[in-house]
């Protein structure tokens, strides 16, 4: 039997599939400029030393095809939000975020972490047993939460699990479409054993995606409603692509992902 669960800081428990998301408890850190979070600082990356990680982790943490699928899917979702977004920024791959995701995935701990990085990052998690044909099988459940989301911010989309697992969850989705979150880095790891709320799953595929700057600020909308690209930050120079503020980079994937 194939099982799959998605997680963020709250949980929604069902028999075969789990989708939930990270909700940050306060927005006091917003006083720090969002640009500080765009690229993870080298000293933070150094605190997760690859040499100290399990030997299996030294393999490539995610394939280039998976990178492309994840980024393209996020941008597809972000460009088609409704109501339309005036300030949606185009999302690109960040290798530093991916390396941090790799280190956490290698721990095979079914929870968000490491805790000292979560004030800098947003994070979505997904786990499943059995084979899969596409990495999007682990990502699409996050988007599926859109059916339970009502703009501008979640109402009853934050059940408390595993003790009180009921009601819809939608904060995976809101992290995916948070307008100012413009970088993503993910890693996938096969865990020989992973404890998922008391049940030991064997040979489970564990996906960790880190986002920067982080989103999901309580009481705030994920984006500003308006004509697409009508409220882009000045740094984008008026460039717009697929209803998103587009950065001044080449569209060569090899350049983005090297």
UniProtKB/Swiss-Prot annotation:
Protein name (record): Peptidase inhibitor 15
Similarity remark: Belongs to the CRISP family.
Stored PANTHER family: CYSTEINE-RICH SECRETORY PROTEIN-RELATED (PTHR10334)
Domain of life assignment: Eukaryota
InterPro entries: Allrgn_V5/Tpx1_CS, CAP_dom, CAP_sf, CRISP-related, PI15_CAP
CDD domains assigned: CAP_PI15
Gene this chain is encoded by: pi15
One term of GO molecular function: peptidase inhibitor activity
Propeptide: 22-60
GO cellular component term, pick one: extracellular space
Compartments in which it is found: Secreted
Job description of the protein: Serine protease inhibitor which displays weak inhibitory activity against trypsin. May be involved in facial patterning during embryonic development.
First and last residue of the signal peptide: 1-21
Chief location bin: secreted
PROSITE patterns listed in its UniProt record: CRISP_2
Keywords (A to Z) from UniProt: Developmental protein, Glycoprotein, Protease inhibitor, Secreted, Signal
Domain SCP: 71-211
Carbohydrate-modified residues: 36, 124
